[in-house]
From Swiss-Prot:
Keyword Amino-acid biosynthesis applies: no
SUPFAM superfamilies: Translation proteins SH3-like domain (SSF50104)
Coiled-coil ranges from the UniProt annotation: none
UniProt similarity note: Belongs to the universal ribosomal protein uL24 family.
Protein name: Large ribosomal subunit protein uL24
Assembly and oligomerization: Part of the 50S ribosomal subunit.
Keyword line: Ribonucleoprotein, Ribosomal protein, RNA-binding, rRNA-binding
MF terms in GO: rRNA binding; structural constituent of ribosome
Length: 104
C-alpha cells in the first residue's frame, strides 16, 4: 500500500502535548511512526565518547510519534487534510481530499 505521509511532507499534530504544532517529516519508520522536525522533543542523557571527540551531557532530540496522530497540512486551506490516491497519466499520485489538489 502506498504511504499517505511521506518524508518532507508538512504535517500538523492532532493529539498529545504538541497538538496543533506543524513541522516537516524527517523520517518515516516501518513501525507506523514518523519523526517530525521540532515535535515530541525528549531529553537524552548521552555519555561522552572520547574516541570520537564527542562530549557528553543532556541532549534534546525528536522522538517518534504515531502516524495516526499527525495529518498532512494543506497550505491552501490552512488546515489538516486527508490524503487520497488517483491515477494521472498512468502514474499514481496523492491529492488533498478537501480541494482535490495534487500533492507536490
Amino acid at each position: 500500500m502506498a504511504a499517505k505521509i511521506r518524508r518532507e511532507d508538512e504535517v500538523i499534530v492532532l493529539t498529545g502535548k504538541d497538538k496543533g504544532k506543524r513541522g516537516k517529516v524527517k523520517q518515516v519508520l516501518s513501525s507506523g511512526k514518523v519523526i517530525v522536525e521540532g515535535i515530541n522533543l525528549v531529553k537524552k542523557h548521552q555519555k561522552p565518547v572520547p574516541a570520537l571527540n564527542q562530549p557528553g551531557g543532556i541532549v534534546e532530540k525528536e522522538a517518534a510519534i504515531q502516524v495516526s496522530n499527525v495529518a498532512i497540512f494543506n497550505a491552501a486551506t490552512g488546515k489538516a487534510d486527508r490524503v487520497g490516491f488517483r491515477f494521472e497519466d498512468g502514474k499514481k499520485v496523492r491529492f488533498f481530499k478537501s480541494n482535490k489538489e495534487t500533492i507536490k
